[in-house]
Amino acid sequence: MEVSKRHHTVPNFYLKGFGSTDSKPKIGAVSLDDGKRLVMPTSNATVRKNFYALDGHPDGADVFEKELSRIEGDASAVIRKAVEGAWSLSREDREILGTFLTFQFLRGPDTRAWMDQTQGTVLSKVITQMGAEGVRKTLARSDKEVSDEVQNRLIQQAVEPDGIIMKTTPAGHIRHILELVPELVRYFVGRPWVLIRFNRKKLFTCDTPVALVRDPEQEDVCAGVGLMTAWGISIPLTREVGLLLSNPMALVEEAADRKTPRELLEDVISGRYDHEQAGSTKMAQLFNSHTIANARNWLFHHPDDADLVPDELPGPRNREVESEVISG
């Protein structure tokens, strides 16, 4: 059986929602690295060779890629229903789409870079605090033999701006995904969902399309935002349809004297508070601005929408962890 080596970090079916409608759909792409604009087949966008490969797995190195394809197939059918007018979703469809969004939130190179940088930052701090002599004494007591050259390189890298460079394996990344999905999916399905249909305005997408939205009333624009604290989560589904997982706190405050948190959560998951609305200029700006800000290396758009992409774009986002290395 042929083993797939071309792994999409954003599914091809999803990118087709922003592509041309010919037999081999194409999508506009803007590189945040050099500003270059091009048109490519959707099947070639966000492809990384062996990104999820599990070498030596009895079911083939592409076993996780195949599992993602299964999840994508189920989600594709649900998104198609929503785009074609079936809203709100059944509980089963909501859980399918919520699970897909959780996987998408975790599966990209941004998460792997975060893992690399987190481990590298921690190790750099530990080595810097120990000092060269402490590192050598610690390594001398270990079972593994580490050459002086490697020791010196680690000590030197620890005090450099980027610290020690770590590389997470596909297996480590996949383990991280599978551990977190059951925990994080609640923060997707447990929000009121708003489907927004745009007529004149068009949406973009990017290589990390699930974006966290900060509370618009938040005065500190530099404050961090996490999955639990985000005011909302925006996901452009196609160039004309966006999905906003909105803030549940208003519901909690409104129903606090009538329902327990568990009862309210059940109501939310049932879709009782979901609704649909027509897109506005302000809402299109919310989606597109968060898509642009959340992109790491590539912004994508329908080939006919190239003129709508701003000339001024941020550069590539390579740092996922901002932490100063402790000097010692």
Can you say where each PLM-predicted feature lies in the sequence?
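Alpha-helical structural context detector biased toward long hydrophobic helices
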Residues: M1-R6, N12-G328
